[in-house]
Amino acid sequence: LVGSEMCIRDSWIGPVWDAAMFIVPMAIYHYYGDTRSIEKLWPVCTKYLAYLAGREDAEGTVTYGIGDWVFHKTQTPTEFTTTCYYYLDNLYMAKFAELIGKDGSSYAKKAEELKLLINHKYFDTSKAIYANGSQAAQGVALYLGIVPKEYEQQVADNLSTMIKANKNLLDFGVLGSKTVLRMLSKYGYADLAYQMAAQEEAPSWGNWIKQGFTTLAETWILSPKFRDASVNHMFLGDINAWMY
């Protein structure tokens, strides 16, 4: 939380969640052409990005946060997902500036620097694989436009290969649930995306239905000892938007 006179240092949730302050006003603008939310949030966004700049490590990455929350087996490195959304924040801030008549050159420059950093540190060009090779890492990099144009299809091809090797089962958390189906569809693997979406074997959306759930759970695997998470939680529900 960034206030006018104090700063509470976040050590848990992190920039992926905080990115809502950029994503929501951008969505409002795209749907309605209305910039009032951008104008209202501009001072907060300015302070927040200054705060994140102060949380960078020596390389320029931001390492805290919960990242691909409720992943199944493979955890995508938090420093990767956090820095990717730090890039998105700056990219959107530059666009906000353009829309409301502010100077966004520093944010555009920062976004480009972060994109270069992410690709230098986390992208293996010889294999066309991001980070630790997780499904979510490939989905996030493609969805946010971080992948160099000449490698986009290769990264998507590798994503499809990972999923097929995992019996068309998902292996991600909230960030993968937002990005993987969309990117499979975008790059020629809509049939594979559908097979993943229609799975009834756990972990899957279909497995919840098979078990009789009529609401979305907070985590993929449920048990009789399920006590610490919600069974009416929308954040793994982007599959609905993907369908339409």
Regions found by a protein language model. Give the residues of each.
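Heptad-repeat amphipathic alpha-helical coiled-coil interaction surface used
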Residues: 29, 87, 93-94, 111
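Short linear capping/connector segments at secondary-structure termini
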Residues: 4, 65-71, 126
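Short, small-residue-biased leader/transition segments that mark boundaries at the very start
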Residues: 1-8
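The substrate-binding groove and active-site-proximal loops of carbohydrate-active enzymes
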Residues: 9-14, 29-39, 70-82, 100
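Internal glycine-rich alpha/beta core junctions
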Residues: 50-53, 58-59, 144-147
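C-terminal capping/lid segments that line or modulate ligand- or cofactor-binding pockets
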Residues: 21-22, 28, 76-78, 82, ...
